[in-house]
UniProtKB/Swiss-Prot annotation:
Its EC number is 2.4.1.-. One of its GO terms (cellular component) is plasma membrane. It is found in: Cell membrane. Gene3D superfamilies: Spore Coat Polysaccharide Biosynthesis Protein SpsA, Chain A. This is SfII prophage-derived bactoprenol glucosyl transferase. InterPro entries: Glyco_trans_2-like (IPR001173), Glycosyltransferase_2 (IPR050256), Nucleotide-diphossugar_trans (IPR029044). Keywords: Cell membrane, Glycosyltransferase, Membrane, Transferase, Transmembrane, Transmembrane helix. PANTHER family: PROPHAGE BACTOPRENOL GLUCOSYL TRANSFERASE HOMOLOG, UNDECAPRENYL-PHOSPHATE 4-DEOXY-4-FORMAMIDO-L-ARABINOSE TRANSFERASE-RELATED. It is a multi-pass membrane protein. It holds the Pfam family Glycos_transf_2. GO terms for molecular function: glycosyltransferase activity.
Amino acid sequence: MKISLVVPVFNEEEAIPVFYKTVREFQELKPYEVEIVFINDGSKDATESIINALAVSDPLVVPLSFTRNFGKEPALFAGLDHASGDAVIPIDVDLQDPIEVIPHLIEKWQAGADMVLAKRSDRSTDGRLKRKTAEWFYKLHNKISTPKIEENVGDFRLMSREVVENIKLLPERNLFMKGILSWVGGQTDVVEYVRAERVAGISKFNGWKLWNLALEGITSFSTFPLRVWTYIGLFVASISFLYGAWMIIDTLVFGNPVRGYPSLLVSILFLGGVQLIGIGVLGEYIGRIYIEVKNRPKYIIKKSHRGNP
């Protein structure tokens, strides 16, 4: 039985040797043929040469190198495209997702699950801000989007070959893999685990990238941000109508003069701000449509070696 590990890497020269050694020395994976698909996402350090060297000595290492940095989501998709295992497991190279969890994922899969989620029961290794923003994102996403995504589940999971083939059929260029992996469906099971500290290096995923990923997740699986502006428009129009009616009554019945420029200026600025926000939301969706219709590839591979080059 063949198990494929899909491992996106970006400037991870310190972590790759530790990860490889840990996988190959882990006794509970010895009964399986374990393929490791490294996807080098445009690294500037020695990452590419390290994974190519591993492939020379180990035919079960598949090194893929992008021509530039395309991002983690395209890297994951490339890994799924090139993984050949009966089951495929995306996993981070930093070993925060422990190798020891993999046998439990395999056990659930062999019991009949199409997808086995690895759920973090403890995120104390993440900073407080990251934990809170992740909690807010999951709650917001699951309120307004379909399908819902399991809270505290990242990319670390096991997928059957059938699920992987279904994912590969999806044509979109704007990728939010957590949503895509949930969208394909199938019988799902969960394994809980405690997230560990990084074995080497530092995280390359900063706050700005997390913000963009959150936007991608919401705009890829929900039209609520567009629909909400209909309700905002109705609300503003209703308030404006009531305020206008009150001004007429106040003038005709009570004889008070019409208020001057301050109220007019505030109204114009308020409506202008509302319109700009609405245009911004609309622009986010139009921009994604623009990217999709150009039909560019999700990624471009510079080098691919299986075994000896």
